[in-house]
Swiss-Prot record:
Its EC number is 2.1.2.1. Homodimer. (6S)-5,6,7,8-tetrahydrofolate binds at residues 122, 126-128. The record marks 229 as: Plays an important role in substrate specificity. Its main location: cytoplasm. It comes from the Bacteria. GO terms for biological process: glycine biosynthetic process from serine; tetrahydrofolate interconversion. Catalyzes the reversible interconversion of serine and glycine with tetrahydrofolate (THF) serving as the one-carbon carrier. This reaction serves as the major source of one-carbon groups required for the biosynthesis of purines, thymidylate, methionine, and other important biomolecules. Also exhibits THF-independent aldolase activity toward beta-hydroxyamino acids, producing glycine and aldehydes, via a retro-aldol mechanism. This is Serine hydroxymethyltransferase 2. Belongs to the SHMT family. One of its GO terms (cellular component) is cytosol.
Length: 415
C-alpha cells in the first residue's frame, strides 16, 4: 500500500525533487519567450498526476482490448467531444503522444513510402516533420518544398506551380517560425487541383484558432494535426482532427499502427484543457496574446531590429539580429543570463549554421499567461534590445535581471 502523505517525491527522491524545485523557481523568475512554451493550469497538471496513469486501455472508447475501461472511456470521449466542438471538426483522435506522432499517423494512414509530399521548407519556417531530410518524413517520402517570396510571405504562386509539376499525394501546411496568417483556403484549392490531400499542422496556432483570432483550417483541410500544449495551453501531447470519412484509417494508424496503449492521464489533461479553451476567458487571453506580440514586435523595430515578414499577425515572430552584429546563439545566451528565455532560430536563407543562426524566435503566450499586458510587452521589448546592444556588459545584464525580477514578482505564474 502507498501512503499519500509519506510517498512524495521529496521523500522518495530528494535529488530529483531538488531539480524539480529549481525548475519551478526558474519558471517563476525568468520571462519565458520561447514561442512553443506556455504554462499549463493546475487542473491540467492534477489530471496528469491522477491514478489514470495506472490504466491500460488499448483501443478506443467502447472497443478496448482490456477490461475495466468503463471510466477511462468517459475520459477519452470527453476529450474527443470537446476538441471537436472547439474546432468544429467532424472527427478526432486524441491519442497521439505528440504533434510529431500525429503527423506520422496521417502519413502512415494515407501514404506509402516513396509517395510525394509537399511541405514548407524548414529553412523558411516549416517544421522537421514536414519533409526535412533528417526526419522520417524526409527519408520515407519524396519531398518537394515550398517557401517564402521576396516579401517573406508564403509564395502561393510558386507552391501552385510545384504542385502542378510534381503532383504530390499530400500537401502539408503549417509552420514553426512564420508570423503571418496562412491562407488555408488557397492551399486547399491547390491541393484539390492536383488531387492531393491537405494536412494542416496547426500546432503553433491552435490556441489562437480555438479563440477565433487566427484562421481556422478545419473547414478546408482533410486532416488537421496539432500539439495540445504551446498556445493551446494543455498537456504535452497531440491530436488529429479529420473529416468523418477518414476516421477509421486514422484510428487504425494510431492504434495499432504506430502506438500501443494510450496515455490516459494525459488524455484527461487534454480534456481539461479543451474545456478551459471553450471558455470566454480563453478567448480574451488569446486576444491579449496577439496584442502583446504586436507590441513586442513594434518595440523591437523601433529599437533597430528587423522582424522577418515585417510584422506578426499571430503570437510568434522571428527577429533578424544582423543589424546588431550578434548571432542567435550569442543572443540566446546573453538574454538567458538576463533571465529572458528565447531560442536561437534560423532566418530565411540564413548564412549561419543551424546551431549558430542569425535570428531568435520570440512568442507571447507564456508571458501573457502570467498576466503581462501591452505595457509589460513594451518593457520586455526594450529590455531585449538593451541586452542585444550590450550583450557582454555586466552592468547592463545586472540591471535587466533586476527589472525582470520586478516584473516576475508582480506577475507570478502560479499564485
Amino acid at each position: 500500500m502507498f501512503n499519500r502523505t509519506t510517498s512524495t517525491v521529496a521523500n522518495v527522491d530528494p535529488e530529483l525533487y531538488a531539480a524539480i524545485e529549481q525548475e519551478n523557481r526558474r519558471q517563476e523568475d525568468h520571462i519565458e519567450l520561447i514561442a512553443s512554451e506556455n504554462y499549463t493550469s493546475p487542473a491540467v497538471m492534477a489530471a496528469q498526476g491522477s491514478q489514470l496513469t495506472n490504466k491500460y486501455a488499448e483501443g478506443y472508447p467502447g472497443k478496448r482490448y482490456y477490461g475495466g475501461c468503463e471510466y477511462v472511456d468517459v475520459v477519452e470521449q470527453l476529450a474527443i467531444d470537446r476538441v471537436k466542438q472547439l474546432f468544429g471538426a467532424e472527427a478526432a483522435n486524441v491519442q497521439p503522444n505528440s504533434g510529431s506522432q500525429a503527423n506520422q499517423g496521417v502519413f502512415f494512414a494515407m501514404l506509402k513510402p516513396g509517395d510525394t509530399i509537399m511541405g514548407m521548407s524548414l529553412a523558411h519556417g516549416g517544421h522537421l516533420t514536414h519533409g526535412s531530410p533528417v526526419n522520417m518524413s524526409g527519408k520515407w517520402f519524396n519531398v518537394v518544398s515550398y517557401g517564402l517570396n521576396e516579401n517573406e510571405d508564403i509564395d502561393y504562386e510558386a507552391a501552385e506551380q510545384l504542385a502542378q509539376e510534381h503532383k504530390p499525394k499530400l500537401i502539408v501546411a503549417g509552420a514553426s517560425a512564420f508570423s503571418l496568417k496562412i491562407d488555408f483556403e488557397r492551399l486547399a484549392k491547390i491541393a484539390k487541383s492536383v488531387g492531393a490531400y491537405l494536412m494542416v499542422d496547426m500546432a503553433h496556432y491552435a490556441g489562437l484558432i480555438a479563440a477565433g483570432v487566427y484562421p481556422n483550417p478545419v473547414p478546408h483541410a482533410d486532416f488537421v494535426t496539432t500539439t495540445t500544449h504551446k498556445s493551446l495551453r494543455g498537456p504535452r501531447g497531440g491530436v488529429i482532427l479529420m473529416k468523418a470519412e477518414y476516421e477509421k484509417p486514422i484510428n487504425s494508424a494510431i492504434f495499432p499502427g504506430i502506438q500501443g496503449g494510450p496515455l490516459m492521464h494525459v488524455i484527461a489533461g487534454k480534456a481539461v484543457a479543451f474545456k478551459e479553451a471553450l471558455s470566454p476567458e480563453f478567448k480574451a487571453y488569446q486576444e491579449k496574446v496577439v496584442e502583446n506580440a504586436r507590441v513586442l514586435a513594434e518595440t523591437l523595430v523601433k529599437r533597430g531590429l528587423r522582424i522577418v515578414s515585417g510584422r506578426t499577425e499571430s503570437h510568434v515572430m522571428l527577429v533578424d539580429l544582423r543589424a546588431k552584429n550578434i548571432t542567435g546563439k550569442a543572443a540566446e545566451a546573453a538574454l538567458g543570463a538576463a533571465h529572458i528565455t528565447v531560442n536561437k532560430n534560423a532566418i530565411p536563407n540564413d548564412p549561419e549554421k543551424p546551431f549558430v543562426t542569425s535570428g531568435v524566435r520570440l512568442g507571447s503566450p507564456a508571458m501573457t499567461t502570467r498576466g503581462f499586458g501591452v505595457k509589460e510587452a513594451e518593457i520586455v521589448g526594450n529590455l531585449i534590445a538593451d541586452v542585444l546592444e550590450a550583450p557582454e556588459d555586466a552592468a547592463t545584464l545586472e540591471r535587466v535581471r533586476g527589472q525582470v525580477a520586478e516584473l516576475t514578482k508582480r506577475f507570478p505564474v502560479y499564485g
